[in-house]
Regions:
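Catalytic cysteine-centered active-site loop
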Residues: 33, 52-103, 148
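Hydrophobic h-region of N-terminal signal peptides that target proteins for export
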Residues: 17-21
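Aromatic- and glycine-rich peptidoglycan recognition patches
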Residues: 2-4, 23-39, 44, 80, ...
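Stable alpha-helical elements in mature extracytoplasmic
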Residues: 38-42, 46, 65-66, 70
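Sec-dependent N-terminal signal peptides
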Residues: 3-16
């Protein structure tokens, strides 16, 4: 009788662990799908602004500065109201390591974590979309004239 109870307990434990492992994998795939659909929504708005002019302190709808642009695209793409400045957006976002960077994450540029002066949105392939002196453009994240301080996830 003791052997039967032991076998039953082992079988039940194995079944339970498989059940939870499957649920965890399912949740992970759902989270990934959600991230992709969120990026698509925000990027759809961002693409419509390509070529719009840069104006310091502007939040849109036809002129932007960098943080005004990210604030605008997240508000109109996802209904998320980001803080106004790049520094405030850095503090607001969940920090992610470069190896975990996903499309839609924010890219923060500055001299240090206490002095962030530019922000853009990662679009994949080592590029971001941002508003800078040439207007709203797609460009490489890494350039000799700036220093990436970190990355942040909004949603």
């Amino acid at each position: 009788m003791k052997k039967i109870i032991t076998k039953f307990a082992i079988t039940a434990a194995a079944f339970t662990s498989l059940l939870f492992a499957g649920a965890a994998a399912s949740n992970n795939n759902t989270a990934h799908a959600d991230t992709n659909s969120q990026f698509t929504s925000v990027y759809r708005v961002a693409k419509t602004k390509l070529g719009d002019r840069y104006v310091y302190g502007s939040e849109g709808s036809r002129t932007f500065d960098c943080s005004g642009f990210t604030k605008y695209i997240y508000r109109h793409g996802l209904g998320v109201n980001l803080p106004r400045t790049a520094q405030q957006q850095y503090h607001y976002s969940k920090k992610v390591a470069k190896k975990h960077l996903k499309k839609g994450d924010l890219v923060f540029i500055g001299s240090s974590k206490r002095n962030i002066y530019h922000v853009g949105m990662y679009i994949g392939g080592g590029k971001m979309i941002d508003a800078q002196n040439r207007g709203v453009v797609r460009e490489r994240i890494h350039a000799p004239w700036w220093h990436v301080v970190g990355y942040g996830r909004v949603a």
